[in-house]
Amino acid sequence: MRMVLTKIVCTIGPRTSSREKIKELIDAGMSIARLNFSHGSREAHLEVIRNIRDSRSGAGRHVSIALDTRGPEVRLRTPEMKDIKVEGGEVLRFSLLSSEKDIWIPGVDLKSLGVDNRVFIDDGAIELRVVNVEEDGFECEVLNSGMIKSNKSMNFPGTDIGDRALGDEDKNDIAFGLENGIDMVFASFVSCRADVEEIRRLVGSKVPVVSKIESCLGMRNLKEIALCSDGVMIARGDLGVEIGLENMFSAQKRILYEVKREGRPVICATQMMESMTLKNAPNRSEISDVGNAVLDGCDCVMLSAESAVGMFPVETVKFMRSICADAERYDMESRKGAGACGVSSYVDGVVICSGTESQIEKIYLSKPETPIIVISESLWILRRFSIYRGIIPVYGKGSEDAEATLRRLGLRGRFLAVGREDVRMVSV
């Protein structure tokens, strides 16, 4: 029985913040725990970080903690934080000032906003048309009915609202995260190399930076962003709103092609198993979405609301893992049929003891279809390669005898359990 190589990123939220539930997610297949700093207090995030660190100690592998920055996204505040039901044709007012009757949107520059501009709420769930712009706010006509909830995101496609990839709150969040042992940063709304370099100056050289592509500018500067990042996330929610949903398919393919060409890992995110937020099985289209992401070469697939607030978080991870396993099995059979298999066809695992980054990258780029167990005392190695497909980072002191090292760390049966005693390995 082969191990699933594709990594699963889970957003931790109210449904999954306890130590017990995090342990269940890890056992189900979670490789990276994502903390979305657009929601929740730092105190709440600190408790989750502690719970993750306690829960991952018995996993036998490094489960990473990712801090997802707020970025320049606009978050609305409804009066008294209550949900607002809206109908098509209705006119709403948005205010830059806190108000008891208007929807509050702090920190937005309205100079570039004009009449007939489109505005979207909650990844496009609600579409609005600007009908009036004033000094302290603006009015919009609602184009489709729905529910507006407090703290949901707003998008202003094609409009400069004075945003920056890294605001003061983000800097404070990152400093807090570094102090408390986060493993990587997911940087929101990265639009150019300078955005990544600014974050690098904050985190130093030992924390990987994954750039989220979710704007037209990010798409335009994709290659330079990929070159200076440790990985790239296809953040399909905001990106779909920014570029138009009808263009999302080709954008996803282009991001994958450009980023993989530079040898960087890719995370596919947003609504991958969305229906499982409320029910215990995915839609057929979601199965195809996850499976095709694996076939296209994604290193990680990500859950957001499904694992943060969903009714079936653990079941969702298990189902996603099964879909990834099926896609990987199909991919390997296809490659065998085409005669494209290499050394991984004849071994059950590759073991790298105290290897260098270049050694690990070289083996990763050969696209083996078996686990690559990287045993290292370097926290940077463990962090960086935790988002690479097929690489299992394990903390430990390696030795020349890979078999002895695996047995000493209790890993041989756990990661190379293929139903035989004669496990075939290649050690590097």
Swiss-Prot record:
EC number assigned by the record: 2.7.1.40
Pfam families: PK (PF00224)
GO molecular function: ATP binding; kinase activity; magnesium ion binding; potassium ion binding; pyruvate kinase activity
Binding positions (Mg(2+)): E214, D238
InterPro entries on file: Pyr_Knase, Pyrv/PenolPyrv_kinase-like_dom, Pyrv_kinase-like_dom_sf, Pyrv_Knase-like_insert_dom_sf, Pyrv_Knase_brl, Pyrv_Knase_C_sf, Pyrv_Knase_insert_dom_sf
Site feature Transition state stabilizer, where: K212
Residues bound to ATP: N36, F37, S38, H39, R75, K152
Top-rank taxon, per record: Eukaryota
Enzymatic class: transferase
Subunit structure of this chain's protein: Homotetramer.
NCBIfam families hit by this protein: pyruv_kin (TIGR01064)
Family: Belongs to the pyruvate kinase family.
Protein name (database record): Pyruvate kinase
Gene: PYK1
